[in-house]
């Protein structure tokens, strides 16, 4: 391990180092990233290990010798040596030269490592396959994706806490591990689900075993007694055949044969469910890469101190044994100090209990009841409590930027959209820019959340050269387009961060968001409140609003006292019905529902010491979603 000089085009990868416990590097995000680098044999990054404030001495690195891949050159630095843009983000993070474009957060960074590794070695198709079907594995943020939340947040944190607690006293098994065990018992859903299930039915018929009948009812005795060893035999599992044929780049010969009539005519409800081979289903993906270091270190402690608890995780241990068969996994693991355990066969406990889809459907129906009727009873209920949609007057409805005098790259027309749409986008920007210009002071830091192609942020950076503007967006291509426009303008007061907004930890004065989808608007407002920053948001996609791990609706006390969650969801559903092709009366109801949903948001922010207004954009025709929520700390 030694210092490395950065080339002008090289990207730097920054990983946090806190400490080691039981041979595991903390935080686990770093262990996971190092394992992926080892699996991909990736050498395209300048890798920097960032010591925490508790251990800032970078001269003595002997304690790291056994913990890091020895074929990977690593530079050890202190937090103070991080580029300014990285100091505003959670690690891991990757930065392009000249330190104005940053990718932060585990999922974003891992996906970028995969893409760069494949670009460096296109012959290794298995690297790109880690991104899964349509290349979407761990692409969605943790707020909307169960797997991203599990892999990026809950499992690493739960295992870290488990490892720390186990050194002092017998810990309890993390609920997150039990949740993962349950998820491995659920039927697999893949894009060619029906085809594979019919192949499995054919296989079972040929073997003389009866498939489960109707909607996930109990499996046959032969199927129920399947052990981990059975699952490791490709001749006995269609799922394994499919999974490992993909890993070895072979074609499944059965796929080209036309199925017999009785197989083709079988009802979908009578088809056997597909079982997990890997974490997300049949294929080895990035999710498995993330989970392996976490689950390995968890199982090490279980086997060493609480071996009697091992039988609680038959599916997890089967997955752990199976993943060792994936080419190059053992080699990559050993380079990272991960030496696989030998786990005894759990003959009795490894029996898989099928998920009863009738029960699942019943639970779903209870947790997500059907919407019945319109919003009028809910609106009347609010009116009886003195709550109505109220809009503050626009402070300057006729104000507009002189778009003709601005450089072409500032205009939304440069964002590859039609002339009509570009005009409406300009009208939307007029509203947000006016409000920001009225609040911004020289030296202020402005953050454009959910920035997309950078329409808001680029205009603000051009109009406010004395302010630092940061664009935060989860979609890489959108942010790359924004940077290209910024480069054409020669802007020097702008940063680009590809990350979920919670991984931005910097201080700022004003937060803006144009058409942040669903709960993203609530996340923006929450982020601004935590920093005591002003906010100007224009919500969108009201129909996607739902309770999450961070938010419960309604949000404000006065709405909570009046409406149930279901009634609030009813307002959200109808708030989305404002499209121009709808009848005027329906659009009016939609606008009122929008106003009520945003009034709840405004009231909740007011409870945190903000002066908040809900204002309609001018002209209102600039967008069906034309509300603005404007908040200033008192």
UniProtKB/Swiss-Prot annotation:
The keyword Cytoplasm applies. InterPro entries: Glutathione-S-Trfase_C-like, Glutathione-S-Trfase_C_sf, GST_C, Methyltranfer_dom, SAM-dependent_MTases_sf. Residues 131-333 form the GST C-terminal domain. Residues 189-233 are annotated as: Disordered. One of its GO terms (cellular component) is cytoplasm. Keywords: Cytoplasm. PANTHER family: GLUTATHIONE S-TRANSFERASE C-TERMINAL DOMAIN-CONTAINING PROTEIN (PTHR13369:SF0), PTHR13369. Belongs to the GSTCD family. This is Glutathione S-transferase C-terminal domain-containing protein. The gene is Gstcd.
């Amino acid at each position: 391990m030694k210092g490395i000089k950065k080339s002008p085009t090289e990207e730097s990868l920054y990983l946090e180092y806190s400490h080691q416990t039981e041979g595991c590097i903390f935080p686990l995000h770093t262990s996971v990233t190092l394992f992926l680098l080892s699996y991909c044999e990736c050498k395209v990054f300048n890798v920097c290990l960032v010591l925490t404030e508790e251990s800032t001495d970078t001269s003595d690195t002997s304690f790291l010798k056994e913990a890091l891949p020895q074929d990977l050159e690593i530079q050890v630095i202190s937090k103070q040596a991080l580029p300014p843009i990285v100091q505003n983000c959670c690690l891991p993070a990757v930065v392009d030269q000249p330190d104005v474009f940053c990718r932060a957060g585990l999922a974003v960074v891992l996906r970028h490592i995969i893409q760069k590794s494949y670009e460096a070695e296109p012959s290794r198709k298995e690297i790109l396959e880690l991104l899964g079907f349509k290349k979407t594995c761990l692409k969605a943020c943790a707020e909307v994706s169960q797997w991203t939340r599990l892999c990026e947040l809950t499992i690493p944190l739960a295992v870290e806490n488990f490892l720390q607690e186990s050194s002092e006293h017998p810990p309890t098994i993390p609920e997150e591990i039990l949740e993962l065990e349950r998820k491995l018992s659920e039927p697999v859903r893949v894009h060619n689900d029906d085809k594979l299930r019919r192949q499995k039915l054919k296989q079972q018929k040929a073997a003389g075993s009866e498939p489960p009948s109707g909607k996930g009812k109990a499996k046959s005795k032969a199927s129920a007694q399947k052990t981990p060893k059975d699952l490791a035999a490709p001749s006995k599992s269609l799922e394994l055949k499919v999974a490992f044929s993909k890993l070895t780049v072979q074609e499944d010969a059965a796929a080209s044969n036309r199925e017999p009539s009785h197989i083709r005519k079988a009802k979908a409800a009578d088809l056997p469910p597909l079982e997990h081979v890997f974490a997300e289903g049949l294929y080895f993906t990035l999710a498995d890469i993330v989970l392996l270091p976490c689950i390995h270190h968890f199982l090490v402690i279980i086997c060493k101190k609480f071996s009697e608890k091992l039988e609680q995780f038959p599916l997890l241990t089967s997955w752990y044994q199976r993943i060792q068969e994936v080419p190059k996994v053992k080699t990559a693991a050993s380079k990272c100090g991960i030496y696989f355990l030998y786990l005894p066969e759990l003959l009795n406990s490894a029996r898989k209990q099928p998920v009863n889809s009738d029960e699942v459907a019943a639970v779903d129906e209870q947790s997500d009841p059907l919407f019945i009727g319109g919003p009028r009873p809910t609106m009347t209920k609010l009116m009886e409590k003195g709550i109505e949609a109220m809009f503050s007057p626009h402070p300057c409805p006729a104000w507009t930027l002189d778009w003709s005098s601005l450089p072409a790259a500032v205009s939304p027309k440069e964002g590859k959209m039609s002339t009509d749409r570009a005009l409406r986008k300009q009208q939307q920007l007029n509203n947000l820019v006016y409000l920001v210009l009225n609040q911004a002071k020289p030296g202020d830091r402005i953050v454009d959340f959910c920035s997309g192609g950078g329409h808001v942020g680029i205009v603000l950076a051009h109009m406010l050269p004395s302010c630092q503007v940061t664009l935060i967006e989860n979609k890489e291509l959108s942010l790359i387009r924004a940077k290209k426009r910024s480069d054409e303008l020669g802007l020097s007061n702008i940063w680009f961060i590809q990350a979920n907004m919670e991984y931005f930890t910097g201080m700022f004065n004003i937060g803006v968001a144009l058409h942040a989808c669903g709960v993203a608007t609530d996340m923006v407002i929450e982020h601004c409140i935590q920093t005591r920053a002003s906010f100007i948001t224009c919500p969108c996609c009201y129909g996607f609003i739902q309770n999450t791990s961070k938010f419960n609706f309604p949000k404000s006390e006065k709405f909570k006292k009046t409406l149930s969650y279901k009634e609030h969801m009813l307002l959200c559903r109808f708030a989305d019905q404002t499209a121009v092709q709808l009848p005027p009366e329906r659009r009016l109801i939609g606008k009122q529902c929008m106003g009520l949903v945003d009034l709840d948001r405004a009231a909740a922010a007011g409870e945190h010491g903000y002066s908040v207004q809900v204002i309609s954009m001018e002209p209102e025709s600039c967008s069906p979603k034309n509300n603005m929520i404007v908040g200033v700390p008192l």
